[in-house]
Amino acid sequence: MAARRTRKDDGSNWTVADSRGVYGIRHWGAGYFAINDGGNVEVRPQGADSTPIDLYELVGQLREAGLSLPLLVRFPDILQDRVRKLTGAFDANIERLEYQSRYTALYPIKVNQQEAVVENIIATENVSIGLEAGSKPELMAVLALAPKGGTIVCNGYKDREFIKLALMGQKLGHNVFIVIEKESEVQLVIEEAANVGVQPQVGLRVRLSSLASSKWADTGGEKAKFGLSAAQLLSVVERFRQAGLDQGVRLLHFHMGSQIANLADYQHGFKEAIRYYGELRALGLPVDHIDVGGGLGVDYDGTHSRNASSINYDIDDYAGVVVGMLKEFCDAQGLPHPHIFSESGRALTAHHAVLITQVTDVERHNDDVPKIVDLDEQPEIVRWLAELLGPTDAEMVTETYWRATHYIGDAAAQYADGKISLAQKALAEQCYFAICRRLHNQLKARQRSHRQVLDELNDKLADKYICNFSVFQSLPDTWAIGQVLPILPLHRLGEEPDRRAVLQDLTCDSDGKITQYVDEQSIETSLPVHEVKEGEDYLIGVFLVGAYQEILGDMHNLFGDTDSVNVYQRADGGIYHAGIETHDTIEDMLRYVHLSPEELMTLYRDKVAGAKLTARERNQYLDALRLGLTRSAYLS
């Protein structure tokens, strides 16, 4: 076990249990992630009762196998465990409530289209699982990957070719539903069904008035991009009736948005949605499926709350609401119980992937107490700050902080006015940060009057840990929508994390940093970390990145894909890896933006030939440039 260190607040020894609390891993880990007694993060890919894998040791093994950091590690066993948990929750509620139909989980591949992800999800045994496609490329993929007889739901904007492909899929033996999102799609379905010679299975997506509170609320409600209004719904039904295809209308679909934090919001919208089921049945349509869309969230921050990055319910609660409300409505109306679909892609995939990187550099404030040999000769503002360097009574801690903050503001203004020199400004800043560090050590989070100042000091005193990755490529949602992802060191968790840091990436962009961190059961602006030792590879893991992050990542500054690998666990607890994908090279990235490496080499040769270099230097330069094109954009 790692050496224990002293805790600041009460003098007791720091233990692994303290780190488990600080990083909240029990709350967001969902039984898959924990901190072992040796102070390393472990993963249990087959659930809380399965054999643990030491993640820090695993990274060492993968690096020995030739992989480099940053590294995306996928655990496909987690995918299958998530499928079993989701389908198990619905099946249990169906049995408990005596619901007279069944449930099929749909995986919307837009969440993560990686082959290993899709294949492992649909390979889960003894469950009912289907696929959803929202574009022609996705439809082409699922037509190939779905097992014969498997369910395929087609959403999104559709042209004639899209609809023809979907109908061909039906003739190939798939259970295909074409969901009408826009009135303009109706005529295309009618015409292509005649051309292909098949009775289409149609779904109707309704646009609900109800809105859920989430970062993706705009996907629901009256201003939603997709779905039919009440008037449009009646018009579409009539057009299918006139074409003699109304008996192919088999599915009702709605979507309230992704990551719905509050289950009560979902209940409110679902109450509206199931009214449409009753109305469509009353119109004589044989609707016997209901696709409740997405919304099942992930507790990213572990607070089990209505925070945007959390949920105040679990999978069983969600399944109970869907099954229970449907049964109650159908029984009251004398309607058959419909087959239930849900598109819970985030809940299925988020946990299975971890991004691992290392700290490459540390930038910290100089908060050592300065030695001032000529204090009397310093400007008044410096003398005032120097007076605050001494001991401070406990009851004066916050007052001292506010005074010091006022003084450092004055120092900045005086420098701008030319009243103090650069050296004097630097001395004032060193005094200020030394005061802040000392006061920080006196503050106690348990004392309410200290909390505001403590939060500010945690922010001001945070080190900058430069890490070997790109926020824009690997964690785009943290930048784009302020998504909170759990982050912690992979090792040294038997030691007290005695520093706080903001993680910054390699990009030449001020937004290339992570600004929110899970800290116990709250969100903070900096992360508790350890001081990086000389020559140490200090490894950081970013967890729950399996949903959307890979496919949404962009190439800002031409940082491309990282190394990635799929790690599987055998029945005996042993592991093996497969599906290794190496990082994009600089050459790959240049080609993507239509810069030909061959043309660049020609230009390099011209420049080298025109430079005042020896023959040996020319060869060395050309070799270095040629080799550079084959390297990773990330640091080696």
Curated annotation (Swiss-Prot):
EC number: 4.1.1.19
One Pfam family in the UniProt entry: Arg_decarbox_C
Keywords for the protein's UniProt record, in alphabetical order: Decarboxylase, Lyase, Magnesium, Metal-binding, Polyamine biosynthesis, Pyridoxal phosphate, Spermidine biosynthesis
PANTHER family to which the protein is assigned, alphabetical: ARGININE DECARBOXYLASE, BIOSYNTHETIC ARGININE DECARBOXYLASE
Residues bearing PTM N6-(pyridoxal phosphate)lysine: K110
Gene Ontology terms, MF aspect: arginine decarboxylase activity; metal ion binding
Record's protein name: Biosynthetic arginine decarboxylase
InterPro entries assigned: Ala_racemase/Decarboxylase_C (IPR009006), Arg_decarb_HB (IPR040634), Arg_decarbox_C (IPR041128), Arg_decrbxlase (IPR002985), De-COase2_CS (IPR022657), De-COase2_N (IPR022644), De-COase2_pyr-phos_BS (IPR022653), Orn/DAP/Arg_de-COase (IPR000183)
Cofactor(s) in the UniProt record: Mg(2+); pyridoxal 5'-phosphate
Cross-referenced CDD domains: PLPDE_III_ADC
SUPFAM superfamilies, per the entry: Alanine racemase C-terminal domain-like, PLP-binding barrel
GO biological process annotation, one example: arginine catabolic process
Recorded family membership: Belongs to the Orn/Lys/Arg decarboxylase class-II family. SpeA subfamily.
Role played: Catalyzes the biosynthesis of agmatine from arginine.
Catalytic reactions on record: L-arginine + H(+) = agmatine + CO2
Record organism: Pseudomonas aeruginosa (strain ATCC 15692 / DSM 22644 / CIP 104116 / JCM 14847 / LMG 12228 / 1C / PRS 101 / PAO1)
Residues binding substrate, per UniProt: I290, D291, V292, G293, G294, G295, L296, G297, V298, D299, Y300
